[in-house]
Amino acid sequence: MGDGSDAERSGGTSSSSALELLAQYEQHIMERGRTLEAIEGHGGERLGPTYEELVEENVQLRRELQGQREEIEHLRKTISLLASGRSGATVVEQQVRPEPSPSVRELALPPRSADRRKNTKNLSLAPVGHEVPSTDRLRVSPQEATSGAQQVPLLTSSKSAEILVSKSPDEDRHLMSPRKTISRSSSSYSNTLGSPATSVLYKNSRISITSPCKSNSTSKAASVLSLPENNTSTENAPHSPHRIDNELDLLTVEPQDGSRYDTERAGGPGPLSPESIVYSDSDLQEHQPSDLSSTTRTDLGKFRDMVDTTFNAEDNPTGSRDKETGTEMEIATLQNTPSRQHESSLVTSPQASRSSITTPVVDPTNTSEPSSLSAAKFGSMSTATSSNKRSKGMGTPSVEHSAKSYSQHSGSPHSNSHQSKKADIPLFVQPEELGTIRIEVISTLYHEPGNAASILFSVVDKKSSKEMFKFAKTFTRIAEFDTFIRNNMESLAVPPLPDKHMFASNVPVKVDSRREKLNDYFASLLYLSPLPFNPALKLAQFISTDPVMNPITGEFAKEGMLLVRKSKTLGSTTTWRIRYCTVEGSIMHLHDHMIDTDTIKLTHSTIELQANLPDDKYGTKNGFILNEHKKSGLSSSTKYYFCAETPKEREQWISVLTTLCDGPGGTAAIPSINSKSEASSLFEQTSISDSSYLGPIANLEAMDATSPTRPNDPNPVSLTSEEEKEVKRRRMKSFFPFKKLATTPTPYAAGNDNASIFSQDDDSPVNATNESGISRSLQSMNLQAQYNAVFGADLRSCLQLSSHPYQGKYEIPSVVFRTLEFLYKNRGIQEEGIFRLSGSSSLIKSLQEQFDKEYDVDLCNYNDKVSVTPGNENQGGLYVDVNTVSGLLKLYLRKLPHMIFGDAAYMDFKRIVERNGDDSKLIALEFRALVNSGRIAKEYVALMYALFELLVKITENSKYNKMNLRNLCIVFSPTLNIPVNILHPFITDFGCIFQDKAPMENGPPVNIHIPQI
């Protein structure tokens, strides 16, 4: 007994534990359910559609897709039937039935929407003799019952139209076997009777380009609008499916005598003959709803409830539904007539009443007569010809009515009209609105993963100049569009597209050229507005497809496509690479197809602008140079050449990069100025520092406080024209002795007749005569009173106009100081081909005129003040670069009316070179003695020091700039108008001559033959 009681107690304990666990589980389930309900109820408005709504929308889309596929298949079969028998023309007949009483009418849905309500897709025809439920039968009048025609019922839902296809007993022998039947879907009949899928008119743009970061609720609201064909605009639309009149197009096949098809001879039935619409039992059973699975039926049931609720709420606001009623209507007859006439008549036969169909209730004031059968499918609409006299005689009044209806309702979706073509896709811009926009090509280097398009467009509103949306295209798509436009606009001049091979090149000049040609092409199209309808509609469709969303910004300071190459690849024009560049912090990353190929540290880097020269051998356009600073010194810096697609884009990159680079003139430390450093050159150091190349005078901010020397006369007199300046300059230079001295061979110019002009002694009578003649001529010309320009003036006059201190002990003209300042700050001494490559001639001329008028121009900040007018963004010669500044310095030196060391000292230097022969050491020592003797004016010594120090630094960086001693002598010997054997020691022994250093033991020999020297 004890054991039994213990067992009972243990069993009761386990049962209670199980019950407690079940209670806890149920409590957990209830809490989870309440939590889910709270989440759905609280966040439904913010989190977007619920799962059930998404499922319903998915089911709806799947059904629409299936219906469209069946419709396409039916159209293909119809086309094949029409192609197989072209001997028959189409006759379309209509029967106008009296309008039923408003009390018994019901607002019927569009055919496709009505099908959705009943969740059935079976509108196939049953074979002859097949039993059909009485509810699906059409009411047949006694007159029809005695007509002797066999009736084939068309199975539809109770809410949809019920149609009987009649044929005479004479045609029974032409029935096809069940194997040759054609299954026709509901969508095919919907197209014939007014399918809303072909009646879409996007009167206004209802799809907006939204950012991908918007909420799901917004996306859901726009999801239905983004459907390609099933969106209908029912508000005030002239062809809305809710405004269909009680007239419908009907079909009847009635072969004419002598033109009846013989199926045995023809091998098949004629197009749209009764044989082509006979259906077998298997086909009928195949579409029965009972074949659907239980899951499908459940989903369709839910979808049916949703559609019923939606349409009841929209179409019947009062909540009451009228009982539907039927009106009797006839089945028109398709007659096979000779195909060569290609004509059909729209006639009404009062004797052809066959059946009734439910029609929608519409406002009598807004009713519009139905359009005729689509002319695109059954031929053009016209009155009957002599071959159709019988049909024409049967319905003459209705022919006039039909013609009137066609002319008035050409905008119907069933007519072959322009407006019906608007239903292809939703349009962001309507054809009639093309005159209010402009299309701009943003980039031809656009790349998006998974998208082959490489050309990015922007559609901008003309009035507000604001961007509406973007879209991307491939060149193939653009070429196809161009072919269509030219076929439809043969009489209009449309500029050609860029050649396809231009899109295979990455040379910046070609990239800019193809972008400009595309801009011209689309600008010309819009300029011709209003365009013919077909081209206008095609253009509207072209810009409304392949939209591009604006990316989410904020992660990088700047990002975009750039053309890049390094300095080591400058020998070839095929080395430009497309890179996606991003600036993150002080690092610039270069990506190639999502792979990080290069990383540039922007700290202490420098930026240079490149002029847009039409003859640039590297094809540079909208370019700039980024010199990456290395810790080991400037000699190991890396130079990157970048090119943007537009000047505006380059300015954006420059503005971002300059704030991140701490180059010369930026936050880099500047050495202090002391007496010792003032007396020495910056380049006594073994390596180039990060500070300005101007050395101790690099503290330009402090020096700006020292105003440049200006003449006392506030209104200096200048020449009236540039031609007069050039004439006077030539007249002055014609008096100097080195132009007229006799030729005597010298040790350094043996065998070089061109260099022997410097062999004349200064003690010779010729020289004395020339000097006296020069003085008298200069005094008689009184040039000083007239010539106050910088270029062409002597050194003393130029210093009086404007000057700047250099190295704390020299005074040099402002034009020389500004050019040296720009070259040192922008690492011009490392620029490849400096002083040999020419800059923008127009910009050099402009800078010369500014210096002549203002005497001092800040070249370092010149580009910040450049203003570009709209339309001139790509014009060359707008921005100052290294080659432009070096060309400006050469122009000033070339226009000096005297030698750089003065005309009086020329013969002294010449005798030293002749006396010492090949001994470069003695030549350097005697040059130094002459410079320090005081016989050469201090202004000449200052200019010599500044210029020759620059040339020394260029030779020290010859491995980067490719300008060795020989190349510099080739450039500056004619520029300074002095022979090479005098110029050479100033560069090779600069330290000995100007800085009291020991001379070089054996200087590098220079053997140059310069014609004119």
From Swiss-Prot:
One of its GO terms (biological process) is septin ring organization. Keywords: Cytoplasm, GTPase activation. Pfam families: PH, PX, RhoGAP. InterPro entries: PH-like_dom_sf, PH_domain, PX_dom, PX_dom_sf, Rho-GAP, Rho_GTPase_activation_prot, RhoGAP_dom. One of its GO terms (molecular function) is phosphatidylinositol-3-phosphate binding. Residues 555-662 form the PH domain. The keyword rRNA processing does not apply. One of its GO terms (cellular component) is cell cortex. Residues 90-197, 258-277, 282-301, 307-421, 702-726 are annotated as: Disordered. It is found in: Cytoplasm. PANTHER family: RHO GTPASE ACTIVATING PROTEIN AT 16F, ISOFORM E-RELATED (PTHR23176:SF129), RHO/RAC/CDC GTPASE-ACTIVATING PROTEIN (PTHR23176). This is GTPase-activating protein BEM3. It comes from Eremothecium gossypii (strain ATCC 10895 / CBS 109.51 / FGSC 9923 / NRRL Y-1056) (Yeast).
